């Protein structure tokens, strides 16, 4: 048919509508009443174009700008304080990549009952030659350490020296002895054996190695004798005092 009419393209072009008859692309095909009924707002092409451009520039800027890592706050130190006082650190070091945490053991509180047990043990050994290890064995208190006994023994010897001097504070051997009211009240809760105040009993321990071994041998014999007596009258088992009893 196109071969029969060579001017078909010109006729088709003449039949096309003029630009004035064409509907602009920006014009909506929905009537205002219909758009209001369906709550359809008229699109704002300029506003959408501006938003798209702003988002594009924001993403481009974030990709080119180096990001600085957010500093993490240092981890807090976990301090477990049992007993409400000074305690001993058990160790340090990093565990699992975390910084060292201060671990503390329960603080020992010397009660009048515990001090009386200490005085009884020192009475068997003698205040002059009593050593912390043997005192700890005689006391037979679970949770009591050698350091606890050594510190208490030193304070008790100073207390006896103050009592021998007849004053609360004094000077012995060139050293000023300062009394502690709380410690003195604890020591006064148990009667002091009379022979503890003898000058011979307040002498320092023997420093000769042979004599020191001899004293330790005698103290070990005292421990064995006490255990034998306890087995005879206590049905074969020593009474163990628990310093930190477990909960029910």
Curated annotation (Swiss-Prot):
Main location as per UniProt: nucleus
Record's subcellular location: Nucleus
Entry-linked InterPro entries: Homeodomain-like_sf, LUX/BOA-like, Myb_dom, Myb_dom_plants, SANT/Myb
Gene Ontology cellular component annotations, sorted alphabetically: nucleus
GO terms of molecular function: DNA binding; DNA-binding transcription factor activity
Organs and tissues of expression: Expressed in roots, leaves, stems, petioles, filaments, stigma, pedicels, sepals, anthers, petals, and siliques.
Pfam entry (one): Myb_DNA-binding
Induction: Induced by drought, salt and abscisic acid (ABA). Down-regulated by cold.
UniProt note: phenotype after gene disruption: No visible phenotype under normal growth conditions, but mutant plants show increased tolerance to freezing.
GO BP field: regulation of DNA-templated transcription; response to cold
Keyword entries, A-Z: DNA-binding, Nucleus, Stress response, Transcription, Transcription regulation
Industrial and biotechnological uses noted in the record: Repression of MYBC1/MTF1 promotes Arabidopsis plant transformation by Agrobacterium tumefaciens.
Record feature DNA-binding region, as residue ranges: 102-161
Role played: Probable transcription factor that acts as a negative regulator of freezing tolerance via a CBF-independent pathway.
Protein name, as recorded: Transcription factor MYBC1
